Amino acid sequence: MPRKKTSVWFKGLELLTRMSAPRPKKKVAVRKTAPAKAAQVARPAAKPAKRAGKAHVGRAQPAGTAGRWIRSYHSAPPRAGHLVNHLAYALYLPAGAARGTGLPLVVMLHGCKQTAESFAAGTRVCRLADRAGFAVLLPEQAKTAHAQRCWHWHGDHAQSEAPAVASLVDAIAREHGFDRERVYLAGISAGAGLASVLAMRHPLRFAAVGLHSGPVFGAASSTMTAMSVMRHGSREDPVHLVDAALDVAAHPGVPAFIVQGEIDAVVARRNAVQLGMQFARINRLLDAQGELRVGEIRTHSRDAVAYTDYVKSGRLVVRVCVVRGLGHAWSGGDPREAFHSDRGPDAMAMMWQFFRRQHRSAADEMV
């Protein structure tokens, strides 16, 4: 057993070491390892677009779904040192959906070594979308940006993919007439790390966030510190990290649903506990010392899951779920897809049940 954990540690270290390498060099690695897929993602970069690239239906629509699977790309505002900033994505419109009908939107951020297709298949989010009546947006990291398709969740926010994802969400919601009061965000691992950044830095776009196997916010500024955070959580007070990064008094708050595997050897469960405290802080349930200022904290266990709930006026604001026997994988997912497990409850269904009770009002308050 120790040898297995050590192997996971070095594999994780290798991933994060690659993350810190200069991005232009990634093109060489992509051509050697996966030329066909890289071409599919990188080709649109040579074609300018006003809002998004030419959409097309296809590219492995998730099995068992009856809606429309659209593949395209978005031209986000350029970042420093990057004249072109294209972001590939998949959009799923549930069966019977009509343009401008005010559907809710769930934004899904995949993890390392995943694609929009694999994440949709593993979480079964599109099948749920058909039943529940929401659209699904799956941004996809390019191999030209990271050889393992990891999102850059640590370090300088402006150099991460967060601004591009925020721009994509705005463009898609505007183009399809989605309900801006019901836009939700979810991610796993590196995708959960980026989702935390978006919820903290771009809170007005999202009514709630779901984080699966994600690192604590604001603790990592480099490759090596990111690896340490994943393995151990933050050595600093997580509440102090939030206060140092944000004006908590001006933050509108974002309800959060957090899922973590008990035996995750890649992202330690302490991260989930600390994330719970951070989101309780921005929702103003905790004070600057991390003490409960309003509401209550409830704990209970059911069906091999330990729950910690932050409740205010009888309303669930933050929930942390630790799934017994689960490693670094999506709970209750399709085990045929990497980083998904059939162990534990269906995390996507649990997140949606939480999401559907949250709305972002026009007054920028949660109702």
Task: Map each language-model feature to its residues.
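Active-site glycine-rich loops that stabilize anionic/oxyanionic intermediates
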Residues: 103, 111-115, 326
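Cap/lid segment of the alpha/beta-hydrolase catalytic domain
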Residues: 140-160
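Active-site nucleophile loop of the alpha/beta-hydrolase fold
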Residues: 141, 210-219
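Alpha/beta-hydrolase active-site loop
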Residues: 154-176, 197
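Short glycine-enriched nucleophile-adjacent loop
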Residues: 192-204
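Short beta-strand/loop motif that positions the catalytic acidic residue
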Residues: 258-260, 264
